[in-house]
A protein has these predicted regions:
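Acidic, low-complexity Ser/Thr/Gly/Pro-rich repeat segments typical of extracellular/periplasmic
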Residues: 2-11, 21-167
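Second-shell loop/turn segments in exported
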Residues: 76-79, 128-131, 204, 236, ...
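Extracytoplasmic/secreted envelope proteins and their assembly/folding machinery
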Residues: 89, 103-105, 143, 190, ...
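Short, charged beta-turn/beta-strand-edge "cap" motif at the junction between a beta-strand
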Residues: 96, 146-148, 185, 223, ...
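Exported/periplasmic cell-wall-interacting domains
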Residues: 166-167, 209-212, 227-332
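Compositionally biased low-complexity segments at domain edges in trafficked proteins
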Residues: 170-197
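Electropositive
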Residues: 197-216
Length: 332
């Protein structure tokens, strides 16, 4: 394994909602399920035994803890496999005052060497991205040596191992109304689609247009409830109201974009763009795509005038490598 370590400062921007939004628009984040907890290996720092009643009053005080990790995304190797574009997202339990010192204690090792760097996106969150996609079918180990942070000697060191699966890269051409899915470099399937039709302007942004850029798959549901609440329409009597149960939904942004089975309107698939921003697919194509999807798979969308923002979901590949590294607290 080759150790790769880097880091970064932060920006977080608001993203326009898309009409295809589900009831719960925020990005899916890893929860501390039993399986996830099992995937995180906790390495305790040295512990000083408690003094006995006869101990001297000058015995060493309990070691201090001033920083812990609250969450790591994605899950570990025992819970899921991840795609070749996957980021490592680390959230701390409080604001990090000395980012450079903390970043220097975050290590990433991969079986297939690749350059990577951290980028701070908030006072508590830092994200690791590689310069090029991870190689498929390998293990990646993340370790946080927080007990080495001055004044934090009582903290526990934490590690998590990730398993990279197949290299899934999908290319959506909104002008030709097709999605080509490549697995390990070979074309596996061509799926007729219908993308966003445009026509609804919010704050100068046409939110009915699908965003063009490099997306990452963030999560998936066999059935997702999608409603009109994103635009403030909650009254069933309103002609604009809708609430639909959509099969085979794979999330690709924080602005409510999914690749999913079309709810009817099959006559438009492969012919014209008629959605509210999502990528609609045939029932068979959507189910197949859902089944092969791993979080961190790459979905490249082309052909629209609405550009994907780098901080819309996991769209970190929208920044070039020089831009990405500027977010690190460690200056080379």
């Amino acid at each position: 394994l080759k150790r790769v370590t880097r880091m970064l400062p932060a920006l977080v921007a608001l993203v326009a909602a898309t009409a295809c939004a589900a009831e719960t628009v925020p990005a899916p984040r890893a929860q501390a399920t039993p399986a996830a907890q099992a995937a995180a290996v906790v390495v305790p720092a040295a512990v000083t035994p408690a003094p006995s009643p006869s101990a001297s009053p000058s015995a060493a005080p309990a070691k201090k803890i001033k920083l812990r990790i609250a969450d790591i995304t994605p899950m570990g190797e025992k819970t899921e496999k991840v795609g070749v574009g996957f980021p490592i997202i680390v959230t701390f339990d409080r604001d990090v005052k000395n980012r450079a010192a903390v970043e220097a204690l975050l290590d990433v090792e991969s079986e297939e060497p690749v350059e990577g760097a951290w980028r701070w996106v908030s006072a508590r969150k830092v994200i690791y991205r590689t310069k090029t996609y991870w190689k498929p079918y390998q293990k990646v180990l993340f370790t946080a040596r927080l007990s080495e942070l001055p004044g934090n000697e009582g903290a526990k060191n934490v590690s998590r191992r990730f398993a990279v699966g197949a290299k899934n890269v999908s290319v959506v051409d909104t002008r030709k109304h097709t999605m080509k899915v490549y697995r390990n470099g070979k074309l596996a399937k061509r799926i007729p689609i219908s993308a966003g039709k445009g026509g609804l302007i919010r704050n100068g942004v046409d939110v009915y247009l699908t965003t063009s850029g490099v997306h990452l798959t963030m999560g998936k549901k066999a059935v997702e409830t999608m409603t009109s609440s994103w635009m403030g329409v909650t009254d069933p009597k309103d002609p604009r109201y809708y609430k639909e149960e959509i099969p085979w939904a794979v999330r690709i942004s924080d602005s409510g974009e999914y690749v999913h089975q079309s709810a009817g309107y099959y006559q438009y698939l492969g012919r014209s763009n008629q959605s509210h921003g999502c990528v609609r697919a045939t029932p068979a194509g959507a189910k197949w795509f859902y089944q092969i999807t791993q979080r961190g798979d790459v979905v490249k969308i082309t052909g629209t005038k609405r550009k994907l923002q780098w901080n819309n979901g996991w769209s970190y590949w929208q920044l070039n490598w020089t831009q990405w590294k500027k977010g690190s607290a460690l200056k080379s």
